[in-house]
Amino acid sequence: MKMFFLVYPDYFDTRITSEVKQAGYKKYTKVRGTTGAGDETSPKLGTPHAPGKNNILLIAVPDEEIPHLLEFVRKMRRDHPTGGFRAFTFPLEECI
């Protein structure tokens, strides 16, 4: 098992949630209103000087589903190069 961890701009929330559900993922955890800075886009700190916020989506999936999810993120990054999409995967040792 892996933990798929996706950081994305809040203004893409409806689309991301819809795509995830259409792909068959009914169970996930969403953290809304996160802030951060990266090296490819402007910071999203929720302030007048760095407006905007991110959301985080976490999905526990079998290893073989990770390539499909990563390809979805690659497509979003191609379609929206300044969007600020970032995906991470982690080994998931246990889920209770």
Predicted feature locations:
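Positively charged, small/polar-rich N-terminal and surface patches that mediate targeting and assembly
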Residues: 1-96
